[in-house]
Amino acid sequence: MMKIFKRILPIVIIVVVVGLVYSFFHIDGREIKNIKKLSSDCKVSVVVSDTYGNENRQEYELNANQIEGLKNLLMNNSYKRRLSSTIIGQLPEKDYSILADWDNDGTSQVLLYIKVIGNEYINFSQQFNIFKHNIYHEIKNPDFEKELISILETE
């Protein structure tokens, strides 16, 4: 009996550790704080600008269908936590700042602020960060930026 226990215990410990490591690095879109509260009652704006400056800056105010599309895009994707706040390499040309305000009895409250850099990195303002560092997470969907642009361009 003890021999079986001695063989099974290390396997169980390894499986638990692997599960914990995976859950730490894997962020599901449904884990984003306040994402489920995003609705047509919110004022959602998206600012698209050049990564290296504010030339060609465009601002979009989203309608109800666009808000629902954005909510689905964010919730139905997954992201990979990074241990560094530094982005190394060539940055994409465009970045997107998503701001959702919720008006509660005349008092505006920021519900959600997300910064997206191209198709590669995303930051959920003060959420999923490590030791108070502002961390950009990797987007695991290779078509994320295309889908975001199609949401912004629909009327």
Region annotations inferred by a language model:
Residues 3-10, 17-155:
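Function-determining sites in protein domains
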